[in-house]
Curated annotation (Swiss-Prot):
<dbReference type="Pfam" id="PF00185">
    <property type="entry name" value="OTCace"/>
</dbReference>
<feature type="binding site">
    <location>
        <position position="182"/>
    </location>
    <ligand>
        <name>L-aspartate</name>
    </ligand>
</feature>
<dbReference type="InterPro" id="IPR006131">
    <property type="entry name" value="Asp_carbamoyltransf_Asp/Orn-bd"/>
</dbReference>
<protein>
    <recommendedName>
        <fullName>Aspartate carbamoyltransferase catalytic subunit</fullName>
        <ecNumber>2.1.3.2</ecNumber>
    </recommendedName>
</protein>
<feature type="binding site">
    <location>
        <position position="253"/>
    </location>
    <ligand>
        <name>L-aspartate</name>
    </ligand>
</feature>
<dbReference type="GO" id="GO:0006520">
    <property type="term" value="P:amino acid metabolic process"/>
</dbReference>
<dbReference type="InterPro" id="IPR036901">
    <property type="entry name" value="Asp/Orn_carbamoylTrfase_sf"/>
</dbReference>
<feature type="binding site">
    <location>
        <position position="145"/>
    </location>
    <ligand>
        <name>carbamoyl phosphate</name>
    </ligand>
</feature>
<dbReference type="Pfam" id="PF02729">
    <property type="entry name" value="OTCace_N"/>
</dbReference>
<keyword id="KW-0808">Transferase</keyword>
<dbReference type="GO" id="GO:0004070">
    <property type="term" value="F:aspartate carbamoyltransferase activity"/>
</dbReference>
<feature type="binding site">
    <location>
        <position position="60"/>
    </location>
    <ligand>
        <name>carbamoyl phosphate</name>
    </ligand>
</feature>
<comment type="similarity">
    <text>Belongs to the aspartate/ornithine carbamoyltransferase superfamily. ATCase family.</text>
</comment>
<dbReference type="InterPro" id="IPR002082">
    <property type="entry name" value="Asp_carbamoyltransf"/>
</dbReference>
<dbReference type="GO" id="GO:0006207">
    <property type="term" value="P:'de novo' pyrimidine nucleobase biosynthetic process"/>
</dbReference>
<dbReference type="InterPro" id="IPR006130">
    <property type="entry name" value="Asp/Orn_carbamoylTrfase"/>
</dbReference>
<feature type="binding site">
    <location>
        <position position="295"/>
    </location>
    <ligand>
        <name>carbamoyl phosphate</name>
    </ligand>
</feature>
Length: 338
């Protein structure tokens, strides 16, 4: 395993192939320990992981905290409603306070895009050793979700040992509200790094044509793309035609607040055109894997029958895989030469 080069993890846009391989190799090791019956290891004993979630979360928050505990780290949980934020303290000052308390890593979720960059910049300016791990920032990025999604697909397609190269030239269909999804953005960076060709499918109000140029989007402090050749992005407005050629499908949650923004005619019409059903899946002659980052809206973006009965619906696999992936990220940040 290479020396880990990142003090902070904000985005997958600056991940190299060796970075991905380090995460997957370590996650696979943790997976094997779990399968052998090992519930806890002392890898991060004496380390303090602080969870700063300013948005509601079930999977990510609990998964990170469980990952930290499985590594024997101490876990400190932040509750916005009972913090000094109610007295006017800024988010950055809150982060500095927890750093001063001795936090080794701050796991942060917030509604503001790029907020983790700002926090990390301030911590570095005061020579703090604390790392920042982005658990979802606005519409920008959700690195651990992107990693666990691609890890789930690699495990599915690998015949024997874990092999990320199995994604090369695979057609991965992403359905839904890409424009408002930090998960989708992280998936685009991760999937394309291994040569997957991505099809984005949905109405133009949720997937604007400019997503074709997604990889040209500037990332703070990044000079060049560490991936020399990425897979392609195409946009489709026909779910049926896209399903016919897909090797895997990632369904995104339809955020119902988009109705208030007049981006959709109705939820029913969206579900009719872009909801994933058994009937639509039958257009593909393979039993392809289905992913969804959760939480799901049953019978809107995906039918209950697909969730409950389709043999390769991997939603629960994603949840399970989130734990070793997040264990790997927490562990690697502590191996950075601070």
């Amino acid at each position: 395993m290479q020396i880990w080069p990142h003090k902070h993890i904000h985005t997958l846009a600056n991940f190299s192939i060796p970075d991905y391989e380090s995460v997957f190799e370590l996650a696979n090791r943790f997976d094997k320990l779990k399968n052998a019956g090992t519930k806890k290891i002392p890898a991060l004993q004496g380390t303090l992981i602080t969870s700063l979630f300013f948005e509601a979360s079930t999977r990510t928050k609990n998964s990170f905290e469980l990952a930290a505990k499985k590594l024997s780290a101490d876990v400190q949980t932040f509750a916005p409603s009972s913090s000094s934020l109610t007295k006017g303290e800024t988010i950055i000052d809150t982060a500095i306070t927890y750093s001063a308390m001795g936090a080794d890593t701050l796991v942060i979720r917030h509604s503001s895009s790029y907020i983790t960059f700002e926090i990390a910049k301030k911590l570095d300016a005061i020579n703090s050793n604390t790392s920042v791990l982005n658990a979802g920032d606005g519409l920008h990025s959700h690195p651990s979700q992107g990693l666990l999604d691609i890890y789930t697909l690699i495990k599915f397609f690998s015949k024997k040992s874990l092999n990320p190269k199995v994604l090369n030239s695979k057609k991965i269909l992403i359905i839904g509200d890409v424009n408002h999804s930090r998960v989708a953005r992280s998936n685009l960076w991760a999937l394309s790094a291994f040569g997957a060709d991505i099809i984005l499918c949905g109405p133009e109000t949720l997937i604007p044509d400019e997503f074709i140029n997604f990889f040209k989007s500037p990332i703070p402090n990044q000079i060049e793309d560490p991936i020399k050749s990425r897979g392609s992005i195409t946009i489709s407005r026909s779910l049926e035609e896209s399903i016919k050629i897909a090797d895997a499908i990632i369904v995104l949650r339809l955020q119902k607040e988009r109705m208030m923004e007049n981006l959709l005619n109705s939820i029913d019409s969206y579900s009719l055109d872009y909801g994933l059903t058994s009937e639509k899946l039958s257009l593909n002659n393979k039993e392809i894997p289905i992913l969804h980052p959760g939480p799901i809206n049953r019978d809107i973006e995906i039918s209950s029958k697909v969730v409950d009965e389709y043999p390769n619906c991997l939603i629960n696999n994603q949840v399970a895989n989130g734990i070793p992936i997040r264990m790997a990220l927490l562990y690697l940040l502590q191996k950075y030469n601070k």
